[in-house]
Amino acid sequence: MSLDSITRTIDESVGGFFEPIATWLGDVIFYAVDINGAEVPLIVAWLVIAGLVFSGWFGLIQFRKFGLALRVVRGKYDEKGAEGEVSHFQALTAAVSGTVGLGNIAGVAVAVSIGGPGATFWMIICGLLGMATKFVEVTLGVKYREMHGDGTVSGGPMHYLPKGLAERFGAGGAKLGKVLAVLASAMILFFGLFGGNLFQVNQSYAQLTAVTGGEDGLMGSSGGALLFGIVIAALVGVVLLGGIRSIASVTSRLVPAMAVIYVAACLLVITVNITAVPAAFERIIDEAFDPVGVAGGILGALIVGFKRAAFSNEAGLGSAPIAHSAAKTRHPASEGLVALLEPFIDTVVVCTMTALTIVIANPPSLSEARAGESIGGVTITSDAFETVLPWFPYVLTVAVLLFAFSTVLTWGYYGLKAWTYLFGRSRASELIFKVLYTVFAVAGSLLTLQTLIDLADAVLFTLAVINIIGLYLLAPVVKRELSSFLQFVRARDRGTDTGTGDAEPETGEDAMTTTR
């Protein structure tokens, strides 16, 4: 039996196994109600309301404290001897590496092809609202993190849900928190294996195949797919052995470089077509509010935009707190402020750049995808760049590979923490997960794009339901932590240090932020 037939059999078997699961879970999670002829998934309302509630509760903190967040990430308020494994900046880049990935490249293309250019506007709105949600969950992640004897840290919803709810509501809260923690861990583990691993490998392989001659090229065979998966799995396995310090060391160098190169390339395409920019913005705004536009007009664009933005920035899912919990700090809210920069970088900056590039270039593959003749994805983005720079798909291939690699690394860490919460923290347990994770990386190069999108979307939003319930219940805790940190900031700015004491009443602008 040839290698091609073996890999084809594996592809068909794995795809046949997961496709029914993806369809069933998608039907449950994306249950929709009909409003004026447009189907509105209830999960979209869940995410929108969460972002609105937290934005109002904390006085639009994503705008009012944006400057403070930048000062914190630069280390202005660092304290010697603070517990943790990595700096604010390293924690941010590790978390960003899990969000700035193929969702920004392939996901945006899918959003524009399904929801039209108007989906871009709603993606930006989702990103801005998600900043407040991210602040809440990361603050909780740091407050209730677990410090181990070897200096390592464990955090995330599997820790702040049981501890926080027990602290606030006693025995009843402890029971509810435990149930939510187990469910959240299962979802993080599931999404880590599929959305954070398989999807990334699948799309990066698709791009590599496209620039090496397509299905008839060097990497077009099943053997090429298997080889690619094995190489990625080996690289991921090596880095995962070093834990969050190793991952942060890689991402703190890789993420800034990737972002700068990618945004610069987008700006080049936009600059070459500078005369088309006003029309592109006009089209985005018009179609965002077009009552009879693409895929259901306003509602269609909003639904697609929010779905893709959530897939990209992960606000409210409980994943980012796992990385941020490792930050060296005595003030949970300080890392929460750092975390609110994530959706801004991921969605407001990078996703917008990708969307503008696609809308301005308007490659033929976009029209084909909107007509339902192809799935689209990373190929649309690649074709958009190629309209200006014929050789750029090769550069994009490198960017896609690096984006995917960093995302797979971070989600490997997230998945490991979920795994050890469920099955115990031991060398044997961790080794089993790492082997399993690398095997899934190999499988990622053998699955179809549509199955991956459906399954990853469903798992992603299931996690959002579980986590946001906990965020609502624990929001008062976050308010107190913010008040305490702002007190510390004022003391530091005055040249004094009041320690970490209890929160005191706020005045002026800070009071407006922390008492709403």
Residue ranges and their predicted role:
Residues 1-102, 112-119, 130, 472-516:
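N-terminal alpha-helical transmembrane segments of multi-pass membrane transport
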Residues 36-65, 113-153, 347-353, 457-470:
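Extracellular loop-to-transmembrane helix junctions
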Residues 137-145, 149, 265-283, 294-297, ...:
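Extracellular/periplasmic helix-exit of transmembrane alpha-helices
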Residues 81-114, 140-143, 149-165, 183, ...:
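Alpha-helical membrane segments and immediately flanking helix-loop junctions
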Residues 57-62, 104-108, 193-205, 215-217, ...:
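Transmembrane helix-loop junctions in multi-pass membrane proteins
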Residues 46-49, 54, 58-70, 180, ...:
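Membrane-interface loop-to-helix entry segments
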Residues 54-55, 96-97, 126-153, 162-202, ...:
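Helix-loop-helix module between adjacent transmembrane segments
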Residues 61-88, 110-112, 116-120, 132-176, ...:
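Flexible loop linkers connecting adjacent transmembrane helices
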